[in-house]
């Protein structure tokens, strides 16, 4: 039978061992997930808006590894993120971007343009992201091997929704996938890139080159390219493959700080070869919506073969081009937002019964390296982000 002093001695040793084990576990977690934990701790809502978030991405991400593994579909991307970031933790991620019963995606009706900045040197890049009312995440990343950037992600693509927000630590974990899933952004060299949907135009490039998916190509450009030409060289070095199960393809606008601007499309009739539509020399502005601009396919009237008539793409294209022409392609930041306001959606009823809105409107300053974001058609509130902090 143990006497009291021996019991006390035993308990003291037990507590010391328990503390030691806990310290080892804490140290292990810090070593394995330190950068991820730091990233998640930086995730916060912007102002009083419960549906707009900002995150400083401090964890490592290996784009070369992603390319080597040829991650291209949404499910492959989520699996890749789970294995790489989760490190064994059973993270659940599911994108809301899926086709309807007709195998189509009738949404994401976006507008992008570049215009000369009337308030100083350089150019502005305007962007409407028209989709459903989902939470939005602005991610600032400063990789050791790559350019710093501000990128915007529709949080529904990484498993969030109005009823699932990153309000607790465990609910924040999915946000780590956002680094691979931007839909537009700007890097420290002033390169901007955005994505617009094109029904029936899901690129399936298939050559010996490595595969890169829909949004990952934007991350690659932001991290690695200082000019439009560098971006085009990068795109030419890979196969851009869009997830066919989503029911939509895409085209991209890329613009740099020197005023070069191009729309990148893919030719469904010729092995999905890349087609380029450049801003004409001497022109101050250039715009794109949700139909093909390549001369081989371009039409002035709605045509289901080259775009989605339900998105009012041709009307939006004519409207934004007329606005840019009215100002000779030279805009202030407020005029850029005014142009976006002319083609935004408020409670747009779709043929499938769903209702779409402009999720956010962005104006990037390609010289000042700033983003002015208006969320959910709240034009009275401007949320500002900068790479110069």
Task: Set out the residue ranges of the language-model regions.
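Extended amphipathic alpha-helical segments with heptad-repeat/coiled-coil character used for oligomerization
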Residues: 246-299
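A recognition module on extended beta-rich or small alphabeta surfaces enriched in W/G with H and D/E
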Residues: 148-159, 179, 285-307
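Secretory/export targeting leaders with adjacent low-complexity proregions
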Residues: 233-244, 252
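Short, Lys/Arg-enriched N-terminal segments with co-localized hydrophobic residues
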Residues: 1-10
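Long, charge-rich alpha-helical interaction segments
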Residues: 301-337
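N-terminal mature-domain region immediately after signal-peptide cleavage
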Residues: 12-226, 240-241, 325-389
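Non-transmembrane alpha-helical segments in soluble domains
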Residues: 219-222, 232-235, 321
